[in-house]
Each structure stands twice: as C-alpha cells, then as structure tokens.
Amino acid sequence: MDGTMGLQGLLCLCLASHLALQAMPTQGSPTDSTKGNKAVNGVVIRSLKVNCKVTSRFAHYVVTSQVVNNTNKPKEVAFDVEIPKTAFISDFAITADENTFVGDIKDKVTAWKQYRKAAISGENSGLVRASGRTMEQFTIHVTIGPRSKATFQLTYEEVLRRKLTQYDIVIKVKPKQLVQHFEIDVDIFEPQGISKLDAQASFLSKEAAAQLIKKSFSGKKGHVLFRPTVGQQQSCSTCSTTLLNGDFKVTYDVNREKLCDLLVANNYFAHFFAPQNLTKLNKNVVFVIDISSSMEGQKVKQTKEALLKILSDLKPGDYFDLVLFGSAVQSWRGSLVQASTANLDAARSYVRQFSLAGSTNLNGGLLRGIEILNKAQGSLPEFSNRASILIMLTDGEPTEGVTDRSQILKNVRDAIRGRFPLYNLGFGHDVEWNFLEVRALENNGRAQRIYEDHDSAQQLQGFYDQVANPLLKDVELQYPADAVLALTQHRHKQYYEGSEITVAGRIADNKLSSFKADVQASGDQGFKTTCLVDEEEMKKLLQERGHMLENYVERLWAYLTIQELLAKRMKLEWAEKASVSAKALQMSLDYQFVTPLTSMTIRGMADKDGLEPVIDKPLEDSQPLEMLGPRRKFVLSASQPSPTHPSSSIQKLPDRVTGVDTDPHFIIRVPQKEDTLCFNINEEPGVVLSLVQDPDTGFSVNGQLIGNEARCPGKHEGTYFGRLGIANPATGFQLEVTPQNITLNPGSGGPVFSWRDQASLRQDEVVVTINRKRNLGVVREDGGTFEVVLHRLWKGSAIHQDFLGFYVLDSHRMSARTHGLLAQFFHPFDYKVSDIHPGSDPTKTDATMVVKNRQLTVTRGLQKDYSKDPRHGLKVTCWFIHNNGDGLIDGVHTDYIVPDIF
C-alpha cells in the first residue's frame, strides 16, 4: 500500500463505563458525501456502534466503526476511544483491504524490548494515554488506500461499581459528522431482577429523548437502544451538522429483597452484598487538611467551600474534629466533639478564618488525627461502637518534620493498627500519587485525586457523600476453606449506604454441595446471615444466559483478582513484590487483559521506523494528554506480516546461533573462533535425542525424530524433529511442541494452542510466547532463551511432513554442568584447523581438525540457519564433522538417546 499521507480525515470515538464517542474533523473542507453523510476530506464514517452487555455487574463493551475513503488518494484516519481507567482492554482489530490486523497481548518487558528504539529516541509509540479525570484515551492513526474502507473494533471489560444507589454507564457522544448507521445498544442481565432503569442524553430535549431512546426492563432483563437516523442527528432540518454532542447516560439498580445474592457458574462464584433497611451508624470523623502555602488560591477557597458543606451534612449523633497542618500542626478542639448546632457553627467559623502557613508536615498532621480517633475509642465504650473515619487532603509531598516516605508509612500503620480506614485525597497533579495510594491501601482505605477545576469543591463533596453513611463495620464474608481455591478480598472495615461489596472466587471440584457464605458484621445491632447456593435457580440462569454467564463470572473473578494484586504489589518490595507481580502478570496473560504489566501489539502495522503500535495501560501518575509528544502514525501492510521480520517476542538474535534444524543439521556457533561447526545425526524415526540437560536445575529439552511419510524400505532417508519436550521438573513446567499444537503441562490436562494462535504464557520462571504460524520463544528468567521454528511445507515438497527447528539464543547463565547434543557446546572449547586442501568433491574444501586430542577430517560446506528467516533461511558456512559428529561430541551419538521427550 502507498504510505503517502493525505490530508487528515479523523474518526474520534471516546468511550466510558463512563464511555464517550467522538469524531473530530481536521483542517480542510469536506469534499464528498455518501447517503447523507458529510465527508471530512473525503472520509466518511459509515457506521459507529457501541454494544454493551452487562451480566451480573460484569460489563463487556465492543466499539465498532467503519470508515470509507471515497477519494483516489490514500488518507490518514484516526480511531479514538476513551475508556475508563478501571477498565482493561481485551481485544483490538483493524480490517482493511480484506486483511485483518489483530492485537497480541504479551508481558510488558518483552514488548518494551521491541520498542526500546522509540523509548530511547523520546518518541511515543503507545496508543493509550491518560485523559481527564476518569478516562484513558486510545488513539491510533492509520493510512487506508484509495476507494477503500477500514473497520476498527475495540473490546474492553470492567466490573461496574455501585455508587450512591446505582450503576452508571455514561457515553460521551461527539461524532462531529452525520453517521449513516449510529447505534448505542445496552443489554443488561441481572439475576436479582432490575429495580430501575433510565437513560438520558444531554444533547436531547426530554421530548426528543422520550421519542428516540428506547428503554425497557422486566424481571432480570433491561435494554436501552439509541439508533437515530441521519435526519434525527441533524442539528436543524436544513443543517449538515450533527446535534450528537454530549453525554448519553444509562443508570440502573437491582432488587435487594433478599440478603443473599450468590451466583455460581462453572465452578466460579460471585457474591454481591448490599443489605438494605439498616440503621445508619453514628460516626467519628476527623478531617486532616493541608494548609501549606502551595494550597494558596483556588485550592484553599474550594477546600473551605467543601468543608462548610460537609459540616452541614453531619448528623447530631456524629462526632468530629479538624486538624490543620503546614509547618506546624494545629487542631480545632484536640478531641472529638458532638455535631451539635453550636459546635458546627464554631467549626464553620474556624474554617472560614484559618490561613495558610509554610511547609508540609504531613506526618505530624496524620499522627495528630489518628491520636484523636484512638483516644476517643479508648476512653468511652460508646465511641468504640461508632464507625471511625480519617479523611486527609493534601496537594503535595512532605517537606517538614518526618519526610522519609517509608518512615511515614510505618508511623501511620503503627498508629492506626487496622482500627479504622484512612482516605487520602490528592489535590492536583503535583501530589505524590503512589505514596498517597499506598498509605490509604495499607490502612483499609482508598485514594482519590481531586482535580484543580471549577468544581473541585463538588468533587470533595462527592467523595464524602460516598462514605457519609456507614451502615456496618468489620464486615467479613466467610466461605468453607476446603471448598474455595481462590478468593478475592472478603474483609472490609466498613460498608456504606448506596455501595456494594463484591467477592468472587473459585470453588474446588465436587465441593458445590458444601459451598456457602457466612456473613457477619457489627452494626446498630449485630449482623449475621448465611447464604446457600440455589442450584435449581442457577440451572435456570444458565439456560437463560448460557455460556455468557459462565464466561463472565470467571472473568469477573479474574478482573477483581488482578486489580487486587496490582494494588497489593504497590505495598510490597523486592521478592514479595516480584512474586505478586508475577501472579498478576500470569492472570493478565491468561485472560488476555491489557494491564499495567502487559502490552498489546498489532502485527502487520508499522510506522516510518518499522515499529508496530503498542497498547499499554497508563499509570495514574501518567502525564496528562496535552503534555505528551506527537503520536506515531502507522501504515497497514498489504498482507499479513512478513515472516522475514525477526520475532517481536524474542530478543535480538546474535549474528550466528547454535541450533538444530532440517534433517537434522546441528549448527554450533564458536564465538571465540568466529567460526561455525556442523554435524548431522542419522537415526530412525521415533528416536528421542537429548538436546539440553541441566542437572543443577533439572531443565531439559528433548526432541523426537520423524521421517518422510512415503519412506522406501531399506533406503536411508532424512529425519526431522517432529516433537519437542521442554521441561523443568523443579517447578512442574512441561511444554510439548509439535507442528500441529503447543501444549502446556500435557500430563495434567493443560491448555492446548495451535500455531494459528498468538499468545504469551508464564508459569513460574518460564515465559512462552507463540508467534502465529512462525515460531515460539521460551525464556527462563534464571537463564536460557530458546526458539522453536515451525516449518510448514508446500504440497509438492519431497519431505511431505511439517517439522520443527530448535535454536539457542542465549545460554550464558546456564550452569557449568549443562550437557546434551547441543548444550555441551555452551561451554568454551578449542580446536585447530590445518592442511586445507581440495576435497574429493571438487566444489568443497577438506581440512584436518584437531579437537579434544583427536584428529579429524572435516569438510567446508553450507547449512541453513532458520532462526531469523523461518521460510527461506540464511546460509551459514561451517566446518562439517562426519559420522554423526564423531570426535567432536562427547562420547558417541547413541549416548544421547533417551526414552521419551519428558
């Protein structure tokens, strides 16, 4: 395809669970139109569809858009989608010119190696950037050919969280041109039954919304459909501009007559806990406020505004105090006082009058607030029965008193001792976010950023509203230890009105009959209940929702588990952090989620530097969108990616490698000699040869020979590797590779992949990456990088069977005792070649080689190395050792025959 960039025609789609859709034209005037669509530089958005399926809070979104280039020149098109920060991308594909380019998810370290060139140059090859308060912006620019079309499809998933008595799905709609087929379709299935459902659009009058938005719910099902015609999209009857510009919002809640909402499918369960009609607990609350000089201006003004409103919301049964910290620490009363009218009036006066002072004694402010709550709980029994809450607001980092982050974390942990939650609010982008979040997570709370904007006071108030009405404290959801194999967080310090606690887990085989949930908590009165599984009801639900229910319950568990592991790793260091990170990475790969530990690449696309695009998940501390450099532009190949390109998931290959391929030729790289040696092994089909054996770790690679399907009896014919076994008994890792399938842990019924798959797998310290129809990489974290090459043969080939090649890319960290037909050559050895002369074959040269105190006749010849080019191979000049490597290998070749590949 011609890579020339024309004038830009941009499709912009912004999505959230919170979703937003947006299409933005660029410079230049419209030049064409199709069936009522107004073209932007000849590029038309033919269709734009958002499909959202919610099953028991698990939301699965698919955004699909088709654009058409009606010009005779290539055009640049951008697909732009905003997704919530809490969501994980799980799939992306582009179809253009009858070719489909799909995303591959792999671990971030592997992906980073591929894109280190872009990172070093300072350019940004990432497609996802932080955008706004709750969103991440996904954007990809591609060039499509003349008179052609491109279809983009993005999939992402999340678990909807209940806030203030409802679940929200918000779609920001801004296509910037009329769209022939525009559709938002939301399908909701909730086993508890839907209690309310509404949908509104900020860009439509109430009358127009009632006419255009179709919404209905009955029993377990709810549906919202917005499908305006081109005429209904017009801003006026004679206009060519669109009125679709604003928020499309769906809200719903579920029935809660039953205390128990326990869902089980395919040995996974989800437990939703949100009891109603409970008496609100009185609370002890201390507000710890940063009054350092950096809070000057709008920050302190809006903080005071929010505090005044929050004080007005306190109930007479609540107790409270205020702590201010700058260079010094001051408290309003120094102990909790009742939220009486007189005390509230005095507190409001104090808030209006306080002024800013100096630096940031964060440690001192927090410890003073904790001391006030601890003192109250220890002094009077009635205080201990209340729900205690500590809320801290700061805009910066500690600069006064104790400033060491580790020491502050320890001081706060030791002072709170798990008695109550700490909520940290960070004002603006200068706040040290990771430190803020870890401090909250270590103390049963959470962190939230308050953005510097006209509505900062409303943001503060909005956060407080979520924790203003505690109903229960010390909530524990318990499950039989022998029936549950994996479990998400099931202990919570407090449960607040309008929220929901969600626990998910995996049930052991044959343990469903003994599975139950015991819930206990402290409230106005003691709270205790037991939930059992209604198996008949589960069967009915499976009949209604089928595979979708089974799949979504498991993915809900995976989503929650990954989120919790990512949060947990922030609190850990060194080996513990590495262990938790490895678990989160493995689950991200298993369930194909783009998380902070994984990346998605799109094969078959490249920018001007030949780099494929990469989809990452930005961290909360990522720079705002406008602070980042220009995005890279990618061109779709006319066909699928060429096999001549090195694998993206395998490190850069040395100029020459050690390996074995074809019938079977062993190629031994001798770097200290800057030379290569070769030999063949002639054995019968079915024989298994030991290629690598490390007795110190148990790691091994064995290969089984196959022959020509049409062999002639009595005639020697070539053999090839048709089956490889890679194993590490110490960790239970086994990988069986054939030209048809790749099987992880075949002895225990592990997953099976075909060579048509693209996947990255991790087990313990081994990472396996499958590159579709080409090769497979195996990386041991403690040493050793290997590649398996797939040889697919054409129908007219004389061999008649597909086979495998095996290459060693890095062996320098393997133990000194590693051995095998290949591995014995990982260690340095010496030889001398002399008496080079014409051989019996006039086209080849013979010589005398002295190696291992033996004198051999060797022949100069050519072999092929397929590690870089699996299809054609690269010619390698080598000294060929005859008679099965006799004299070069230790012992004789039959010493390396083993019973099986494992």
From Swiss-Prot:
Modified residues (Aspartate 1-(chondroitin 4-sulfate)-ester): D663
Record's GO cellular component terms: extracellular region
Pfam families linked to this entry: ITI_HC_C, VIT, VWA
Keywords assigned: Glycoprotein, Phosphoprotein, Protease inhibitor, Proteoglycan, Secreted, Serine protease inhibitor, Signal
Bias-annotated ranges (Polar residues): 637-651
Oligomeric and partner information: I-alpha-I plasma protease inhibitors are assembled from one or two heavy chains (HC) and one light chain, bikunin. Inter-alpha-inhibitor (I-alpha-I) is composed of ITIH1/HC1, ITIH2/HC2 and bikunin. Interacts with TNFAIP6 (via Link and CUB domains).
Similarity comment text for this entry: Belongs to the ITIH family.
Gene3D superfamilies: von Willebrand factor, type A domain
Presence of the UniProt keyword S-adenosyl-L-methionine in the record: no
PROSITE patterns for this protein: VIT, VWFA
Post-translation changes: Heavy chains are linked to bikunin via chondroitin 4-sulfate esterified to the alpha-carboxyl of the C-terminal aspartate after propeptide cleavage.
Boundaries of every VIT domain copy: 29-158
SUPFAM superfamilies given in the database record: vWA-like
Protein species of origin: Sus scrofa
PTM sites of type Phosphothreonine: T394, T399
Main subcellular location of this protein, as a coarse class: secreted
Positions where Phosphoserine occurs in the chain: S121
Domain VWFA: 282-442
InterPro entries linked: ITI_HC_C, ITIH, VIT, VWF_A, vWFA_dom_sf
UniProt keyword Signal present: yes
The protein's role, per its UniProt record: May act as a carrier of hyaluronan in serum or as a binding protein between hyaluronan and other matrix protein, including those on cell surfaces in tissues to regulate the localization, synthesis and degradation of hyaluronan which are essential to cells undergoing biological processes.
Maturation propeptide residues: 664-902
Protein name, per record: Inter-alpha-trypsin inhibitor heavy chain H1
Region called Disordered, residue ranges: 637-656
Residues annotated as glycosylated: C52, N69, N277, S639, T644, N741
